[in-house]
């Protein structure tokens, strides 16, 4: 992992690392930034799988959910995890404790439950953005 990207991911504006998985082929790190306006879930990958999928050595995906949509997010995550404390950090930690769960699975869960979110992904070769809902508020959370 490049030192600059590690610093951004781990220490960026109150980001709490919830899960870190390392294998011989891939490192996955999931973090959460909580602000009064909403939350930002960040997933950084690095390794052979990332190189195969994105043609880049590392990739970062971010999902932003506004404060008004947090109850729906917690509800949809708590459904399959009834024994987990109903807080976002606990639910996300439990979700990503499963080595088979990828960041795209979280996005699929949000889409299926119709929980609005903004998405941003970036790496050394490209940036992708998808905004839904209050674009100004979503933009503020991404700053």
Where are the predicted features?
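N-terminal low-complexity, Pro/Thr/Ser-rich intrinsically disordered segments
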Residues: 7-8
């Amino acid at each position: 992992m490049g030192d600059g990207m590690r610093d951004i991911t781990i220490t960026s504006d109150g980001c709490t690392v919830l899960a870190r998985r390392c294998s011989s082929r891939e490192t996955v790190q999931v973090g959460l930034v909580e602000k009064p306006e909403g939350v930002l879930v960040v997933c950084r990958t690095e390794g052979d799988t990332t190189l195969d999928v994105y043609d880049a050595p590392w990739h970062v995906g971010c999902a932003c959910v506004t404060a008004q949509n947090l109850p729906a997010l917690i509800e949809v995550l708590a459904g399959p995890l009834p024994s987990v404390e109903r807080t976002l950090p606990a639910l996300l930690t439990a979700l990503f404790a499963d080595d088979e769960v990828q960041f795209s699975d979280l996005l699929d869960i949000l889409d299926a439950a119709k929980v609005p979110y903004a998405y941003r992904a970036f790496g050394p070769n490209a940036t992708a953005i998808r905004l839904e809902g209050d674009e100004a508020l979503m933009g503020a959370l991404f700053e």
